[in-house]
Amino acid sequence: MAAPCGSELPANSPLKIPKMEVLSPASPGGLSDGNPSLSDPSTPRGASPLGPGSAAGSGAAASGGLGLGLGGRSAASSSVSFSPGGGGGGAAAAAAAACRGMSWTPAETNALIAVWGNERLVEARYQQLEGAGTVFGSKAPGPAMYERVSRALAELGYERTPSQCRERIKTLRRCYSRVKEHGVGKRKSSYTFEQLEQVFGQGGWDAQPCQPVLINSSGLYQELESDGSTMEDYSQEDWGNHSQDLHGYPTDQELDEIPVTKRTLKIKQESSEEAQKRDIMQNIVQILESVQLKWELFQSWTDFSRLHLSNKLAIFGIGYNTRWKEDIRYHYAEISSQVPLGKRLREYFNSEKPEGRIIMTRVQKMNWKNVYYKFLEITISEARCLELHMEIDWIPIAHSKPTGGNVVQYLLPGGIPKSPGLYAIGYEECIERPLSPHMEQSSLDPGKEGRVDLETLSAQASLQVEIEPTRIIYCYLGIAEVRTLQQCLFLHFQANTKTFSKDWVGINGFLSQNCIVDPGVSPKSIYIKFVEVERDFLSAGSLVECLEKAIGYPLKFNN
């Protein structure tokens, strides 16, 4: 059981040294993965040096010339070490060792790499890419950096001082430089060359959105101790070959255990959602392009502190170009109908947000050259109008059987709000197109003359044309400002056909004419959709033009 730091052990308590990895004797010019300060072969790998200010350590050094240290870590078992030495020399050595820190377990090392990569990436973002194409600037990290790293490790369950973190980072950087320059490493490690390349090289570190994936330290220790190869040299290629075993990703065997049906269903669901998002974004891009807005170059954070962006709703787009192609392309487009434009744009240019992290990473990796934005300010009513178009589903209007000859009645659905708002009326359009080439060829093939193809005859008899998927055409946008949504729709659909006149125009005339049908012919399928809007907002904006830009064609009965 681990003892807390600073506690005293009974005099008759035997010192138990856990089975840990033993470092090789230091060799000139050779750097190992372990702490260089603990190169004494008599010192166990898991030795815990005396920490500064430790009462137990100072007492032991003064009385018996033995430096005792207790490591209180929550995620790794503590260990006790002893080393002979005089009182003064032992205290000095203990103080120096305390700065270097106790040996690091594989889990701690991987946590440190993940945390360090995130912290360095955050620091680089605030340097405004002064590295001229490099991921991290040349400025050395200061004490505040190691303080943040120490706190981050503590949140993951690893108690490490800033000094210990600094020494371990130095060791990792030396290991990386050795393999990078000479292509060899001293020994097997709990991390891969790719991990060090991300944090110390120019490849770029992808920030971890959540707690880093850590390695099973106990399992890794078993492997390292059992294969007897901790003293071998490994090339850079060997480092990369171990990456599959060291990363915490599911193996092929684990993936095969997932039922095929569930995996297929999930893929189909994700593809459907992605297709829907892509269609919405294309619609928003169409709106932005139709009003011919100019791209603005993103230069600094102060761009979005301007007052006129603070509380406005807008349609906005994020664009980019590359060093090879100056044309600006869309990365993302959105209708900011719930969140003010200024706040939403800051999220896309804030490296701490998921949206901003993607953009900054692509600029840092030189995938993009510059980032741009454009926006179109909209009113609340226009935002609700676009919501009506993109997010509200059509509701079909049923009709009764013909009564009194050739007249049908519309049957409005229940649940129409008794409140102000916007509503749209549309009708179903079936687009006919010629028979498919295969069907035409089979019907005209001279080689089949005199023979009866029952399948072809049946298909031609039941379907003379191929019908496109249902498309609903907008024909009217209504504003329920004086009356409620329920009252407005009732006036449109419950008009008395007996008072119908040929002079009627507009939406009421269209709906009334649709009620008069020839025998055996069904009327057009009519649809409605509506959204509630506060009455005070309905008078602002150009709602009809807004919807026409969104759908790409004029409303037939609003002009």
UniProtKB/Swiss-Prot annotation:
Keywords carried by this UniProt record: Isopeptide bond, Phosphoprotein, Ubl conjugation
Region of interest called Disordered, as start-end residue ranges on this chain: 1-62
Residues with Phosphoserine modification: 13, 24, 27, 32, 48, 436
Domain Myb-like: start-end pairs: 103-173
Biased composition (Low complexity): 46-61
Pfam family, any one: Myb_DNA-bind_4
UniProt key word Cell division: no
Lineage top rank: taxon: Eukaryota
InterPro entries: MSANTD2, Myb_DNA-bind_4
Transmembrane spans: none
Per UniProt, location of the Glycyl lysine isopeptide (Lys-Gly) (interchain with G-Cter in SUMO2) cross-link in this chain: 268, 343
Record's protein name: Myb/SANT-like DNA-binding domain-containing protein 2
Source organism of the structure: Homo sapiens
